[in-house]
A protein has these predicted regions:
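His/Asp/Glu-enriched short active-site or ligand-binding loop at hydrolase and phosphoryl-transfer sites
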Residues: 205-215
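Short acidic/histidine-rich active-site segments
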Residues: 233-249
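Mid-to-C-terminal alpha-helical segments outside catalytic/metal-binding sites
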Residues: 254-290
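An N-terminally biased module of ancient metal coordination in phosphate/nucleic-acid-related enzymes
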Residues: 1-70, 172, 289
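Extended substrate/RNA-proximal surfaces in nucleic-acid metabolism proteins
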Residues: 49-148, 158-163, 170-183, 191-199, ...
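Hydrophobic faces of well-ordered beta-strands that scaffold small-molecule active sites
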Residues: 2-6, 37-39, 75-79, 103-105, ...
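C-terminal regulatory/interaction regions
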Residues: 173, 177-182, 246-249, 275-290
Length: 290
């Protein structure tokens, strides 16, 4: 089971502060059942100006610490990119999640629709697949999904409980259909954002935060999460864990075990056909990182 979104790397953003904090978080994630964890610090211009190489190196170091502690977790490097007016500065050197083509991203609290859409277009143009974090917590994405109605239903995918129970390959089927789509229209070439009425690329996936279903972010987000879940908007599930002390509230085993939708999303591995990425490492990078 893979956690696609954590802030487990120490002293890089608003997540873990020390290595001890990171190890405590890792132990909680392993106890919950995760076997692989994506290390995804924020990438925000002027706040967290991180480079892919910094994240790779930090991931390697923490992996060594976990191995020494006997914590059975596979760490994948990644970033959580902010889709704002500065995102284009990072788009030339994007860091996907491990050996997938998934690029984790989020919208600002006061999102400019044009910049968000332009950011999604840039990710797709670079050959990656946007994985949007916690749309239930973001007004822009929540309202867009509601406006579109049955999100995945519009693409001909059956996300009803019966279908999920009968077919354990429904997610892979979704991905195959998704990538058979024709290429979207290219973004504008000037430095202005796309017009707010432009449609986002169809090759956009969404992950839910497990804590959204447990009430960690409050009742409004909890309602939003269940509403999007009913619409079939989500492809994957993540903890978005920032600190060890919140693990008890976020990683609620009963909530996870008793909900077939959440269970199914947790089985998504992000390495289905057409998502795999050929990893080419230069000198100084280690294959063991992946």
């Amino acid at each position: 089971m893979i956690d696609f979104h954590t802030h487990i790397l120490p002293a890089l953003d608003d997540g873990a502060i020390t290595v001890d904090d990171s190890i405590a978080m890792a132990k909680s994630l392993a106890a919950f059942g995760y076997t692989s964890v994506c290390c995804t610090p924020h990438c925000i211009k002027g706040y967290y100006d991180l480079t892919p190489q910094q994240v790779r190196e930090a991931t390697l170091m923490l992996q060594a610490d976990l191995d020494n502690e006997g914590v059975q977790l596979d760490l994948w490097p990644g970033m959580e990119y902010m889709l704002d007016e500065y995102f284009r500065e990072f788009a030339e050197d994007l860091l996907p999640l491990g050996n997938t083509k998934l690029v984790l991203c989020e919208a600002p609290p006061q999102a400019h629709p044009g910049f968000v859409q332009e950011g999604l277009e840039l990710i797709v143009e670079k050959g990656f697949v946007p994985l949007v974090a916690h749309p239930e917590r973001t007004t822009y994405f929540f309202e867009r999904i509601l406006a579109r109605g049955q999100c995945n239903g519009e693409r001909g995918i059956d996300f009803t409980p019966t279908a999920l129970h009968e077919s354990r390959t429904s997610i892979q089927g979704f991905l195959k259909k998704l990538f058979k789509r024709k290429n979207h229209k290219p973004r504008t070439t000037n430095h202005e954002p796309l017009h707010p009425s432009s449609n986002e690329p169809e090759s956009v996936l969404y992950h839910a935060n497990l804590g959204s279903f447990t009430g960690f972010y409050g009742p409004k987000v909890q309602r939003n999460a269940y509403e999007l879940l009913k619409l079939g908007a989500y492809t994957a599930l993540a903890s978005d864990l920032h600190e060890s002390r919140s693990a008890a509230v976020v990683l609620v085993q009963d909530k996870f075990e008793n909900n077939p939708f959440l269970k199914k999303m947790a089985e998504f591995d992000g390495i289905a056909p057409k998502i795999q990425k050929d990893i080419k490492l230069g000198e100084g990078e280690q294959i063991g990182l992946f």
